[in-house]
């Protein structure tokens, strides 16, 4: 039986338009002010040093780092330093009520159903763990973090790497064959399946004709008790 479900956020629990049309512009507009106002103190100075390490430029100036961050945003680069900085900026937006975290209406009822079945539910996203927690604690449905057993970001590895899913399995203590991964991205699901996980692909739009994973349009159609392990 499935003992743990790990779900992606963007395009899976949450409309991709919320991320690209609300969260990303909000962070972009405030990024330079956030950096310059805090560059001499934590956490900003630590994040800037992390970014210097990422780009192998230990002497990079703040101006160069800001330029790099904007470039990474343009490229949708999965930079841990960028994701952490965005998370700090989004915190202000969530706390001030500038927006709430979007969740598809089928998500929370399914999370409650799975939780009632004693299935542990985890989040795995390229967004930082603090940013993930903000979305689920300030969601359209209120604070639903009580339904979640934990959060993972790219510190366990990239989402298209097989080793990332093995790392998550080890951290949760759940054997790979009893793990179920939900995502809208075929390549992520391919990596999870190669690691030994079960997979379901969320299709919120047109079907993925190149995918070999089971495809559903709603969390309502996912019944982990029926998935053989």
From Swiss-Prot:
Transcription listed as a keyword: no
Family statement drawn from the similarity comment of this UniProt entry: Belongs to the HAD-like hydrolase superfamily. MasA/MtnC family.
Pathway: Amino-acid biosynthesis; L-methionine biosynthesis via salvage pathway; L-methionine from S-methyl-5-thio-alpha-D-ribose 1-phosphate: step 3/6; Amino-acid biosynthesis; L-methionine biosynthesis via salvage pathway; L-methionine from S-methyl-5-thio-alpha-D-ribose 1-phosphate: step 4/6
Source organism, top-level taxon: Bacteria
Keyword field: Amino-acid biosynthesis, Hydrolase, Magnesium, Metal-binding, Methionine biosynthesis
Keyword Metal-binding among UniProt keywords: yes
Annotated S-S bridges: none
EC number, as in UniProt: 3.1.3.77
Function: Bifunctional enzyme that catalyzes the enolization of 2,3-diketo-5-methylthiopentyl-1-phosphate (DK-MTP-1-P) into the intermediate 2-hydroxy-3-keto-5-methylthiopentenyl-1-phosphate (HK-MTPenyl-1-P), which is then dephosphorylated to form the acireductone 1,2-dihydroxy-3-keto-5-methylthiopentene (DHK-MTPene).
PANTHER family reported for this sequence: ENOLASE-PHOSPHATASE E1
Protein name in the entry: Enolase-phosphatase E1
First-level EC class: hydrolase
InterPro entries per the UniProt record, alphabetical: Enolase-ppase_E1 (IPR023943), HAD-like_sf (IPR036412), HAD_sf (IPR023214)
Subunit structure: Monomer.
Species this protein is from: Cronobacter sakazakii
Biased composition annotated in UniProt, kind: Basic and acidic residues: 220-229
Catalytic activity: 5-methylsulfanyl-2,3-dioxopentyl phosphate + H2O = 1,2-dihydroxy-5-(methylsulfanyl)pent-1-en-3-one + phosphate
Cofactor requirements of the protein: Mg(2+)
GO MF annotations in UniProt: 2,3-diketo-5-methylthiopentyl-1-phosphate enolase activity; 2-hydroxy-3-keto-5-methylthiopentenyl-1-phosphate phosphatase activity; acireductone synthase activity; magnesium ion binding
GO biological process: L-methionine salvage from methylthioadenosine
Region of interest (Disordered), residue spans: 208-229
